[in-house]
A protein has these predicted regions:
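Catalytic and substrate-binding clefts that recognize carbohydrates or anionic sugar/phosphate headgroups
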Residues: 5-7, 34-235, 245-246, 251-252, ...
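Aromatic- and carboxylate-enriched substrate-binding clefts and catalytic-loop regions
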Residues: 16-20, 267-543, 578-579
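Catalytic core of carbohydrate-active enzymes
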Residues: 418-430, 437-448, 470-480, 485-715, ...
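A low-complexity, Ser/Thr/Gly/Pro-enriched, surface-exposed linker/loop concept
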Residues: 1-39, 77-80
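Solvent-exposed beta-strand/loop surfaces of large extracellular or lumenal domains
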Residues: 13-32, 335-340, 623-642, 743-758
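Extended Gly/Ser/Thr-rich low-complexity repeat segments
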Residues: 5-23, 49-65, 71-73, 725-742
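Beta-sheet entry/capping signal
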Residues: 1, 40, 47, 56, ...
């Protein structure tokens, strides 16, 4: 990892501490040499050359092959000055009598905000840009989550600004095995033309970026996690099925939904309460209290859900209505932005203010967490502003002017929960679903979804590259609203009762089975499985089939979560990450790897009876449904009846499955597991287990069982178990099956190595 910084100042320059980067610089052995105007710095992996004449920096392999180079004279720092007139008032503070600015604009009628004296703030900054030269045919990924449908991010201009459905991350990764993170949090334009590739940000003190070289896609993501923070373990139950809609209008309805799932015997782990649980009046917006009369007995609701082993997530926004207690408390601290949010009676809080973050958590803790809330749905964390003037973004946050830090705002809303929930207890893992994110959001236990998208096969297809590009930015937990947020329009007028929409929903449901989070949600039309018909009707049966498949995969999903945490791995992987030398994978946007084993090819065309699937050339592939072994490096045509999503398993994969049906993820211990071997190559897998929903694993309370397959000798080795934890299964049965054959053996495992020959 190389940090490159450029300023107009000379001498020792104290650059600001990064808000996204947590990795501290370390001593690295570097050989430095100079020849004329060229300065070369070489490490054991990388060579960096600085042209003192043009300011160009070039990155190369040790063999001299170029990875990336800046453009000659490709840097710009244009001085800018912002002037702001703000109001002041005396407020409660840690320092007696301290004056804290409310920062409402002159003459602005801001409900709930006091008026006071005026003063002027002048900020000197720069518009900063840096241009690079990429190879003409070089393919790059990343830039957060976009809704363009593009996998390759070349040949376009993108304004990176946090918005609903668009997550702004100024980072791209190349198929050449490197990544580049532009460390600037203001609105930034990415521009790629035949003349060059550039980042241009509207405010910054300096050019500041990080070059990461891992040699391949997986290794570069791992470096990005080292740079910006590792993703902690998620609770096991979060990998089960989630049900939601916009919105459950009473606590009785919430409990009724859970009861119906249990009565039907369809697995369910999480239910999500969307907005208005605080009441219907906009002045009570996001009070973070159950003030709605239809939620007057929240303790009863949590008690009922607890008896059914159903967890709850709740919607919390960063804006607060002017009639709420929390609004008034934040207002006293001068911690509300002056701009109008949604609704107009609400204002967004300054998440960069640690005291304000503490206030928000205090309400979440008192009125939600202590009652039994298990997870947090952080909506509109861009945040949303309406009719804001440019001068409004001169607001001085605790990290500088808001315009300078706008894009990193969602990271701090997640930080508010992570820091404070962990300070409250380590017995329950933080789990956050946030609509916007930034480099480093993963370190706070946050994942994202793709926002308020509309229902169509075209939009569905675009979610695949949106999620893959987002995951490449180092944030591993991502999902979508199954069936899209908006189901209505000119196409699906009856939504869940419309066979055409049911087809879209079921195809989307299959895709979601192979996402890090499997979650049904949307507006206008109910989404519960029983709303689509009764058991025996295809739209019900296929959903149930895939929910049960999801639960059978829990050992694989949880073990992959450990690889994400321990080794910086990813659930969602573009095919080039699996086969980096297969150029045919580079542009593919409608297939992906799910973990190490599964190649998934969602059905993204209406009424499709088959679809073509490219199998990378790095190995053989096995049809998940039939066991047929196929050579890589070819396109196959796979039949796609409504119950089938094409899934192929990489040869050599070892996939653990549960053997007992459950109603929730932790209902039964894994004392009997199937190990399914997909032959054709050597393989390995690490089965991971821990206490499921606390942080004891950070102190070593977990176990790993290494498993290897020797394809030539046809020997499976289940290695010695490493580690221990409270409640660990000490003795279990493994049913070992060879995919595509009748070969099967059952063994008893007590933690000592076993070798099974076939």
């Amino acid at each position: 990892i190389v940090r490159v910084s450029k300023t107009l100042e000379s001498g020792n320059v104290n650059l600001r501490k990064s808000l996204a980067v947590v990795l501290e610089p370390t001593q690295v052995e570097v050989n430095v040499s100079r020849q004329n105007d060229m300065v070369k710095a070489s490490s054991s992996l990388l060579e960096v050359i600085l042209d003192l004449n043009t300011g160009r920096v070039q990155f190369s392999n040790l063999d001299g092959s170029k990875l990336l180079t800046e453009k000659d004279y490709g840097v710009q720092l244009m001085p800018l000055q912002y002037v702001q007139r703000i109001r002041e008032k005396k407020v409660e503070s840690h320092v007696a009598g301290e004056v804290v600015p409310t920062q409402s604009a002159p003459g602005q009628n801001t409900p709930g905000l006091d008026r006071g004296k005026m003063r002027t703030i002048v900020e000197n900054t720069y518009e900063v840009s840096q241009s690079f030269i990429l190879d003409e045919d070089e393919v790059i990924y990343g830039l957060g989550q976009q809704q363009t449908g593009k996998m390759n991010q070349r040949n376009q201009r993108l304004v990176l600004e946090q918005n609903n459905m668009q997550i702004a991350v100024p980072y791209f990764a190349s198929v050449k095995g490197y990544g580049l993170y532009w460390d600037n949090y203001s609105i930034t334009t990415f521009d790629d033309t035949p003349m060059g590739t550039s980042f241009r940000s509207e405010a910054g003190e300096a050019i500041d970026y990080y070059f990461l070289y891992g040699g391949n896609g997986d290794a570069t993501v791992a470096l990005l996690r080292q740079l910006s923070g590792q993703a902690p373990m998620v609770p096991l139950w979060t990998l089960g099925f989630w049900q939601c809609k916009e919105r459950y209008k009473s606590q009785d309805e919430v409990v009724e939904v859970a009861e119906k799932y249990r009565k039907l015997g369809v697995p369910l782990d999480g239910i999500i309460q969307d907005w208005r649980y605080w009441g219907e009046d906009n002045s009570s917006w996001n009070a973070i209290q159950f003030l709605n009369p239809n939620f007057s007995r929240p303790q009863e609701m949590f008690s009922s859900l607890r008896k059914m082993n159903v967890k709850m997530m709740i919607s919390v926004w960063p804006s607060f209505g002017n009639g709420t207690e929390i609004f008034k408390e934040l207002d006293k601290k001068g911690a509300l932005y002056p701009m109008v949010s949604s609704p107009r009676e609400a204002r967004v809080y300054d998440a960069f203010n640690p005291e304000a973050r503490g206030i928000v958590w205090d309400y979440m803790n008192r009125y939600m967490f202590q009652l039994g809330m298990s997870a947090w749905w952080m909506d509109a964390t861009e945040p949303e502003f309406y009719g804001a003037k440019q001068s409004d973004f001169n607001f001085q946050t605790k990290e500088g002017a808001l315009r300078n830090v706008r894009n990193i705002y969602p990271l701090y809303t997640s930080k508010a929960i992570w820091d404070n929930q962990r300070a409250t207890t380590l017995d329950k893992r933080v789990y956050i679903l946030t609509r916007s994110a930034y480099i480093g959001s993963q370190r706070y236990g946050a994942g994202s979804w793709s926002g308020d998208i509309r229902a169509s096969f075209d939009v569905f297809k675009k979610q695949i590259p949106a999620g893959l590009n987002f995951s490449i930015c180092g944030i591993p937990y991502w999902n979508t609203d199954i069936g899209a947020w908006h189901p209505y329009g000119n196409v699906y007028n009856t939504a869940h009762k419309d066979p055409a929409y049911q087809q879209l929903y079921v195809r989307w449901f299959q895709f979601a089975t192979f996402n890090p989070m499997m979650r049904s949600h949307g507006t206008g039309s109910p989404r519960e499985i029983y709303q689509f018909g009764e058991r025996g009707y295809w739209a019900f049966d296929v959903q149930e089939q895939y929910i049960k498949l999801r639960y059978s995969l829990l050992p694989y999903l949880y073990s992959t979560a450990w690889q994400v945490t321990k080794n910086g791995y990813s659930y969602l992987r573009q095919l080039s990450m699996e086969a980096p030398h297969d150029t045919s994978t580079y542009q593919i946007s409608d297939e992906f790897m799910f973990g190490s084993a599964f190649l998934v090819a969602p059905v993204v065309e209406e009424d499709a009876v088959s679809r073509s699937v490219y199998l990378p050339d790095n190995t053989k592939w096995i049809d998940f449904w039939t066991g047929q072994i196929l050579d890589g490096g070819q396109v196959v045509e796979r039949a796609t009846p409504i119950e089938i999503i094409p899934v192929y398993v990489k040869a050599g994969s070892i996939v653990p499955f549960t053997t007992n049906e459950v109603q929730y993820a932790t209902e039964r211990k894994w004392d009997k597991l199937e190990l399914r071997i997909y032959p054709g190559d050597n393989g390995e897998f690490v089965l991971y287990e821990d206490e499921n929903d606390n942080y004891n694993y950070e102190s070593g309370a977990y176990s790993e069982i290494p498993i290897t397959w020797d394809n030539e000798k046809r020997i499976l080795t289940i290695g010695d178990r490493k580690g221990r934890f409270a409640g660990m299964v000490k003795n279990r049965k493994f049913i070992v099956n060879i995919a595509g054959s009748s070969s099967s053996k059952t063994v008893c495992y007590n933690g000592r190595e076993l070798r099974i020959e076939f």
